[in-house]
UniProtKB/Swiss-Prot annotation:
Residues 264-273 have a biased composition (Basic and acidic residues). This is Putative uncharacterized transposon-derived protein F54H12.3. InterPro entries: Integrase_cat-core (IPR001584), RNaseH-like_sf (IPR012337), RNaseH_sf (IPR036397). It comes from the Eukaryota. GO terms for biological process: DNA integration. Residues 252-263 have a biased composition (Basic residues). Coiled coil: none annotated. Residues 1-146 form the Integrase catalytic domain. Residues 252-286 are annotated as: Disordered. Residues 274-286 have a biased composition (Low complexity). GO terms for molecular function: nucleic acid binding.
């Protein structure tokens, strides 16, 4: 929202928080991403909720990992986690889309770009709308409404310990389908945890040889894993091109030889010169 800050008293960012249980939205305005300002906004969110949360999930930005926020969370006994995957915080990202859509409709209707005056009204409207994920309004959700948790062992274990795997690479919306969709690095599954996740090993054993593994933080869920069996047949395309280039015959450049056409052109030029000279002399004599 930085492009609208001139019309909204310098408000550049919006701190969006969502309660995963009730899907209730809490939004605070920020003029910068400084740690002190973010910590104060989080404190206001805690007061609005009424209780401090047990866990906070966020990205690994410096606006959350600084001394001010760390002190606030330690004071309220709150744990902060940040996923290392590209896919993270999907619930709040979807909430951002809903919030931006409603703000854009309001600004289009009013023919201006000022939204701070009605921001909390828009948030209140979202909280009073039925959420498709839970089938209820977030403001109507009470503790105990969803007493049946998801089964822990609902995901089947796809890989065994010792399997060599690759990680699925992030794909864009317009990426070509024939391009490689997996990382070049190969990992070996070392252990399986509950809920189902696979921890990578520090080294991989291929044909009895110990090969160091690339550094990888955290555990990997089976959803982004792909089995990799033909390890010995992997090679980069550029090496194949060089190997093939040795057998390609070189194309020799052949200079064009002077043929009969060139001689005829020279003879025609000489004849033209003599004819023009003769005609010129005859005209002077007369």
């Amino acid at each position: 929202m930085s492009r609208y800050k001139k019309d909204n008293d310098g408000v550049t960012f919006l701190l969006v928080c969502i309660d995963i249980y009730s899907r209730r939205l809490f939004v605070k305005t920020l003029k910068s991403k400084k740690g002190q300002e973010v910590a104060e906004a989080l404190q206001d969110v805690f007061k609005e909720i009424g209780v401090t949360p047990m866990t906070i999930y966020s990205d690994d930005g410096k606006e959350f990992y600084n001394s001010h926020v760390k002190e606030l969370l330690a004071k309220n006994f709150v744990n902060l986690f940040s996923p290392k995957s590209e896919i993270k915080c999907a619930i709040v990202e979807r909430a951002n889309r809903t919030l931006k859509t409603r703000l854009a409709k309001y600004m289009t209707q009013k023919y201006n770009r000022r939204y701070v005056d009605v921001l909390q009204q828009v948030v209140n409207g979202i909280n009073n709308s039925v959420n498709r994920g839970i089938g209820k309004k977030p403001v109507d959700v009470e503790r105990g409404d969803f007493s049946t948790p998801m089964p822990v062992d609902s995901v089947k274990i796809k890989f065994r310990v010792g399997d060599h795997v690759r990680i699925a690479a992030k794909r864009g919306q317009f990426d070509k389908g024939y391009e490689q969709g997996w990382t070049t690095e190969v990992y070996m599954s070392n252990s399986t945890t509950t809920p189902t996740a696979h921890a990578p090993s520090e080294e991989s054993i291929i044909n009895g040889k110990s090969i160091p593994q690339p550094m990888l933080a955290g555990a990997i869920f089976g959803v982004i894993f792909g089995i990799f069996c033909l390890i010995l047949h992997v090679c980069l395309v550029r090496y194949l091109v060089k190997a093939r280039a040795k057998h390609i015959p070189k194309v020799r450049k052949v200079k064009a030889k002077k043929g009969k056409k060139d001689k005829k052109l020279k003879e025609s030029k000489k004849s033209d010169d003599t004819s023009t000279g003769a005609s010129t002399g005859s005209s002077i004599a007369m």
